[in-house]
Amino acid sequence: MLIIPAIDLKDGACVRLRQGRMEDSTVFSDDPVSMAAKWVEGGCRRLHLVDLNGAFEGQPVNGEVVTAIAKRYPTLPIQIGGGIRSLDTIEHYVKAGVSYVIIGTKAVKQPEFVAEACKAFPGKVIVGLDAKDGFVATDGWAEVSSVQVIDLAKRFEADGVSAIVYTDIAKDGMMQGCNVPFTKALAEATRIPVIASGGIHNLGDIKALLDAKAPGIVGAITGRAIYEGTLDVAEAQAFCDNYQG
């Protein structure tokens, strides 16, 4: 299982939100490229970037920062989400050296777009499913739909999606542990690899994900925990690598 540091971008700075609320943000650095360097030097094998402004505005806003990070680390797999709602945007990011694009809102509102994107950019598409009480949320989590996460995930199995990033909104940024039972249920219900996100606080939460014994859980995204020092990236990755269960 990969430990994936998150860099959330708002107005060019690296921030963390609580439960997806833009008004409840903490600025951790005004130099996201240096922040990326910190996690790379700490041994991370993939980075998770989110354009928060883009998620709310429906188009990339912090694209220059994303490109700068991708250029600095050309061999590091980078995934970007937030405001990706057109093939042109995906093409822009892929040309900039980004490994994966995460389609969120558009995947819920227009699922056929995912198949289109997978066909145009094979192996590059991840679907981001953000949920509240098992139902998918969209538009920077401002709207909660009547669509169930597992039902939607199954719909994408035939499209060639590389992974699903599953985030429990109630947990995100709260550092109270992630929703292990639902993450496990999702991983077991679909053939698509699942990356857990939201609520990871410490090594105990990483162990809980591993203890779930769901081979489909291939990664864990962590944000506030690594910024506030309750989780160490290198230690957590070593723990995953050496886990015997």
UniProtKB/Swiss-Prot annotation:
The active site is at D8 (proton acceptor), D130 (proton donor). GO terms for cellular component: cytoplasm. Pfam families: His_biosynth. Its EC number is 5.3.1.16. Its main location: cytoplasm. It catalyses: 1-(5-phospho-beta-D-ribosyl)-5-[(5-phospho-beta-D-ribosylamino)methylideneamino]imidazole-4-carboxamide = 5-[(5-phospho-1-deoxy-D-ribulos-1-ylimino)methylamino]-1-(5-phospho-beta-D-ribosyl)imidazole-4-carboxamide. GO terms for molecular function: 1-(5-phosphoribosyl)-5-[(5-phosphoribosylamino)methylideneamino]imidazole-4-carboxamide isomerase activity. CDD domains: HisA (cd04732). Pathway: Amino-acid biosynthesis; L-histidine biosynthesis; L-histidine from 5-phospho-alpha-D-ribose 1-diphosphate: step 4/9. It is an enzyme of class 5 (isomerase). InterPro entries: Aldolase_TIM, His_biosynth, HisA_bact_arch, Isoase_HisA-like, Isoase_HisA-like_bact, RibuloseP-bd_barrel. It is found in: Cytoplasm. Keywords: Amino-acid biosynthesis, Cytoplasm, Histidine biosynthesis, Isomerase. GO terms for biological process: L-histidine biosynthetic process; L-tryptophan biosynthetic process. PANTHER family: 1-(5-PHOSPHORIBOSYL)-5-[(5-PHOSPHORIBOSYLAMINO)METHYLIDENEAMINO] IMIDAZOLE-4-CARBOXAMIDE ISOMERASE (PTHR43090:SF2). Belongs to the HisA/HisF family. NCBIfam families: 1-(5-phosphoribosyl)-5-[(5-phosphoribosylamino)methylideneamino]imidazole-4-carboxamide isomerase. This is 1-(5-phosphoribosyl)-5-[(5-phosphoribosylamino)methylideneamino] imidazole-4-carboxamide isomerase. It comes from Pseudomonas putida (strain GB-1). The lineage of its organism: Bacteria, Pseudomonadati, Pseudomonadota, Gammaproteobacteria, Pseudomonadales.
